């Protein structure tokens, strides 16, 4: 049972600056139970509840509304899936100068697809409206859970582990949230954390002066001291501070820096004046203190957090991949039987040691699947060229399979793609968001003969133009040396048994 404190969790009222930031960033600011309100349709001024949007979504009750948008519960009539649809008035956001802001938020959500981040499903538009279709998270805000009392240490640790996993992923994609707080952490029906509201987020490409943020934004009680100085700050370090505040609240049931007078509260933040409750274990107190270090240069980093003894207890790296523009999660019950690995050309949630271990495992992988006659028939022409066909390509190689894997990892490192390996299948995941999300490519190796393999390349996510450009400019030039051009050997394989040819 959660222990209920005598005083409820209190958040200070917004300052004028915070009010404006909230106005710009949080399109949904007011919850409501009104079910009579309805979204506007591209075909009529009003669409009643129960109407069908874009021949795909049945509109349900109003969940919330703000100055520029309304959010509705809806149901995908084809899959039966519940979703949340944000309906934005184009004219209002254009007049207010927020069109670029909306585009940036959509772009960021496409970039940071992760099991612990609210999923952007699709974006639709008409002449007057923008429809942002999001995952519907049933459990509500984590704030409401903590407001009833501080959490058990194991529960708080699990929420914190999921938060750090998602933040680490965002940072690896060059995205800094800048408004992490309990109200922006939702819980799904399985009790997992979902980070939401990327309205104040910034991407590394936007930053000036060697990656320094200049904008004063965020929620007062969660602001890092360097943000208050208005002299510029690193988004990653500011996010870590906010995570430290969240961890403190999860375990204490109240804010570390709190005062009715906001100037007094800012002074406490700037000086780092807080005290851990007596029920904090020494390990937890040390972790919180490292995260709430007022000096950003000595503040603990994400990799250090993930190596901390308190954090590591019971922690499992979440495993997932993007396929056909959908996020797919790999659930393994046994960490010791881990059949997939991760490496990257950029920073990621896996440590350098993990990456080295995974690369060394390649030599002990199981034998790749062999092609039978029907497989060969379906491949049709194995002439050794990089045969392209729509969203897939293949070639024959006589190179060792470990060499092919290494070359793919080398290419990924050059273009800063993430690499996920499982047996003789390699998944390359880009970080640049396209119209259909980041480019994701799967490369599979099949045994053709004891000395020949077929390497098959398929697009699993992203748009076709980006895929073709990547194949033509990156994959093909670097893999050509591994291609096998001895047609007679391939033709010999293609001589199928008479019963198959018939």
Swiss-Prot record:
GO biological process, one term: signal transduction
Needed cofactors: Mn(2+)
CDD domains: CIPK_C
Stretches for region Activation loop: 197-226
Keyword Manganese in annotation: yes
Region (Disordered): 32-51, 331-359
Binding site for ATP: 63-71, 86
Keywords, ordered alphabetically: ATP-binding, Kinase, Manganese, Nucleotide-binding, Phosphoprotein, Serine/threonine-protein kinase, Transferase
EC number: 2.7.11.1
Main function: CIPK serine-threonine protein kinases interact with CBL proteins. Binding of a CBL protein to the regulatory NAF domain of CIPK protein lead to the activation of the kinase in a calcium-dependent manner.
The protein's name: CBL-interacting serine/threonine-protein kinase 13
Organism this protein belongs to: Arabidopsis thaliana (Mouse-ear cress)
